[in-house]
Design a protein with these regions (language model features):
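Detector for the c-type heme attachment site
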Residues: 43-49, 67, 81
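Bacterial N-terminal signal peptides
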Residues: 4-15
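The canonical Cys-X-X-Cys-His
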Residues: 32, 36-47, 100
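Twin-arginine (Tat) signal peptide motif
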Residues: 1-4, 29
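Short beta-strand/turn micro-motifs at beta-sheet edges
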Residues: 48-51, 74-76
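Electrostatic cytochrome c docking/interface patches
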Residues: 18-35, 50
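Extracytoplasmic electron-transfer domains, predominantly the class I c-type cytochrome c fold
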Residues: 56-106
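Short, solvent-exposed mixed-charge patches
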Residues: 110-112
Length: 112
């Protein structure tokens, strides 16, 4: 009986674990958008309705980032975890990273 319970628990983890982890990896897009509107707008166009922050924006818009063919959640995580000379030394918590990544990925357009 005990081995049956252990096996059932392991199977549940295998079946439901990846789905829960995948949902957690992307965070909350609404929270990510709110954070990005406060922290990222000096250089990036964060929202599709936002006016460019500079006359000649140097940083790509979040829409352009989301729709670049090479953009993936893991790539965004690596980028946000690594300092870059053109970006301020913005340190995001793991939850903030997931939320911002969730927002960026929510901007990705469906391909036909």
């Amino acid at each position: 009986m005990r081995s049956t319970l252990v096996l059932a628990g392991l199977l549940g983890t295998l079946v439901f674990g990846p789905a829960a982890q995948a949902a957690d990896e992307h965070g909350d897009p609404a929270t990510g958008r709110a954070f990005a509107l406060q922290a990222c707008t000096p250089c990036h166009v964060v929202s599709r309705r936002q006016v460019s922050p500079q006359r000649f924006a140097v940083a790509p818009s979040f829409d352009a980032i989301a729709n670049a063919p090479t953009t993936t959640p893991s790539g965004l995580h690596a980028f946000l975890s690594t300092p870059h000379p053109t970006m301020p030394n913005l340190i995001l918590s793991p939850e903030e990273q997931r939320d911002v990544i969730g927002y960026i990925m929510s901007l990705k357009r469906e391909t036909q």
